[in-house]
Amino acid sequence: NRERLLYSTLPAGRRVFHLDFDGAGRLERVEQVLTLARFSGIALNTWTQADVERTFGPPMLVERVARFDGDIWTYRFMDDYEPRMAHIHIDRAGTVRQLVFSDDQPPGDDRDF
């Protein structure tokens, strides 16, 4: 029986690792999954909250906004060398409806862009 463990550096970090073990308990593979490519693979209107949590682990932040009837799960990640955030909108039925990316400006970074 194969097993996958998930190791997360969230909420402060920007990496989540899948650790895949073979039936004898030997580590076969380590993969960092908080990537733009992985987030872009989320199938809107198909993926569920369980799919998101199984792939990326618990989010760093869960929040609600007035114009969406559900939760927004936020993950921090690095896109090349740029700090970013992925905001996954999950409706009340547990289905992913929208994915939005934003820049993650570090606290105290008051540069005028």
Where does each model-flagged region fall?
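Acidic/histidine-rich, surface-exposed loop or edge segments in extracytoplasmic proteins
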Residues: L27-A37
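A cross-family detector of function-defining hotspots
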Residues: N1-R26, L44-F113
